[in-house]
């Protein structure tokens, strides 16, 4: 049987306990968890990386704001150009495939005609061959009948 015991650390910044120690039969294991402090759960659990950030509105006249806006505008422009290029590439590929499809359809028509001509030639030849075989067998049977009478 596995015996489990837990030990909670004391609440840290903003009432958050960050590390729980769990004792298993296999040994101790530290598991990072975010747990609100206090029985009432009055505050939200906040990740440590988010605790130091404060969302204060940025001054629109500051250099940092202007730099961020400029970087964002360049990123948007780059994204739109990339999207436009992708659309043009797709359109070009569609046109290439249409041309190839037309070429292949023409080839199918040509090969179908060729097949039809060859099929007709084959059937005509087979019919002539059958007529020749039949006439030869008729000649042989009449010749055999003539030879039998001699």
Curated annotation (Swiss-Prot):
Is ATP-binding given among the entry's keywords? no
Gene Ontology terms: biological process? B cell differentiation; DNA-templated transcription; enucleate erythrocyte differentiation; immune response; integrated stress response signaling; liver development; mRNA metabolic process; natural killer cell mediated cytotoxicity
Per UniProt, which keywords does this protein have?
Activator, DNA-binding, Isopeptide bond, Nucleus, Transcription, Transcription regulation, Ubl conjugation
Q: Where is the composition biased (Low complexity)?
A: 28-37
User: Where does this one sit in the cell?
Assistant: Nucleus
What InterPro entries has UniProt attached to this entry? bZIP, bZIP_sf, C/EBP
Domain bZIP as annotated: residue spans: 62-125
User: Record's CDD domains?
Assistant: bZIP_CEBPG
Q: Which GO terms describe its molecular function?
A: DNA binding; DNA-binding transcription activator activity, RNA polymerase II-specific; DNA-binding transcription factor activity, RNA polymerase II-specific; DNA-binding transcription factor binding; identical protein binding; RNA polymerase II cis-regulatory region sequence-specific DNA binding; sequence-specific DNA binding; sequence-specific double-stranded DNA binding
Here the cross-link named Glycyl lysine isopeptide (Lys-Gly) (interchain with G-Cter in SUMO2) sits at: 3
Q: Where is the composition biased (Basic and acidic residues)?
A: 56-72
Chain spans, region Leucine-zipper: 97-118
GO CC term, one of those recorded: RNA polymerase II transcription regulator complex
Supply the Pfam families for this chain: bZIP_2 (PF07716)
Q: How does it assemble?
A: Binds DNA as a dimer and can form stable heterodimers with CEBPA and CEBPB. Interacts with ZNF638; this interaction increases transcriptional activation.
| Sequence similarity | Belongs to the bZIP family. C/EBP subfamily.
Q: Give the protein's function.
A: Transcription factor that binds to the promoter and the enhancer regions of target genes. Binds to the enhancer element PRE-I (positive regulatory element-I) of the IL-4 gene. Binds to the promoter and the enhancer of the immunoglobulin heavy chain. Binds to GPE1, a cis-acting element in the G-CSF gene promoter.
Tell me what this protein is called. Answer: CCAAT/enhancer-binding protein gamma
């Amino acid at each position: 049987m596995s015996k489990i015991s837990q030990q909670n650390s004391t609440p840290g910044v903003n009432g958050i306990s960050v590390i729980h120690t769990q004792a298993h039969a296999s040994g101790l294991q530290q598991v990072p968890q975010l747990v609100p402090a206090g029985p009432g759960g009055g505050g939200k659990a906040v990740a440590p990386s988010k605790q130091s950030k404060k969302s204060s509105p940025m001054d629109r006249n500051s250099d940092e704001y202007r730099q961020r806006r400029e970087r964002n505008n360049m990123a948007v422009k780059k994204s739109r150009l990339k999207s436009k290029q992708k659309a043009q590439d797709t359109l070009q590929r569609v046109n290439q495939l249409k041309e190839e499809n037309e070429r292949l359809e023409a080839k199918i028509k040509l090969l179908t005609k060729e097949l039809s001509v060859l099929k007709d030639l084959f059937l005509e030849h087979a019919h002539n061959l059958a007529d020749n075989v039949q006439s030869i067998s008729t000649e042989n049977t009449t010749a055999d009948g003539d030879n039998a009478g001699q």
